[in-house]
Amino acid sequence: MKSFRCRCIATLIGAAFAASAANAATIATFADPAPDGSTPLFAYDGSALTGGWSLGGLTLLTPGLPLVPDIANATFTMSPLTVNSVNGSVVLLSGGQIDFFDGVDLVFQITFDGASLTTPFGFGASEFAGYNVQFSGPNVPGDLSAEAFAFAFANPQGTPNDFTVTASFTSSAIPEPASLAALALLACAGLRRR
């Protein structure tokens, strides 16, 4: 009987483990803090993309950082990204780093090996997204995989080769489900002792 219960619990925990392994969770996100295009978050000049926000009004929501409360009036900086190539409306950019602050201290850092930028003057969505992404920071869990981020652009001003935009942001990752496997082992061990 105990063996049957152990198998049932292990199966349920294994199913939860498999389900969580396939689902990404939002780590941090924010809505566009700019009231209009006169206060952009990003600028592109045909050779580089620069960005950041130091004005008020950016609330960084942190559902995937349990030790970090949502941050009102957050700021961020980004290293300048140089253009590697242009293919129509898609621009491939160098890697870089984005740092989010609570006004003083670093709370969330994104590093990436490269990025793509779709220019905001064609049909469809316009965004900036990184690849080979890694999240870090003082309270960022170290057991994340498949990290990803994207900025969705709005309020473009300028031309396709020289523009500024405002943006909203989201980031996601798949939490490492190793803790669920440990729970399964503990549950089986607990049933064996009874």
Segments from the language model and where they lie:
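RTX-like calcium-binding, glycine/aspartate-rich low-complexity repeat tracts
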Residues: 2, 25, 181
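Bacterial N-terminal signal peptides that target proteins for export
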Residues: 2-9
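Bacterial N-terminal signal peptides
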Residues: 10-18
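Sec/Tat signal peptide C-region and signal peptidase I cleavage site
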Residues: 17-25
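N-terminal segment immediately downstream of the Sec signal-peptide cleavage site
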Residues: 24-92, 153-173
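Acidic, glycine-rich flexible loop segments
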Residues: 95-96, 100-153
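A short, hydrophobic C-terminal helix/tail in secreted or cell-surface proteins
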Residues: 175-193
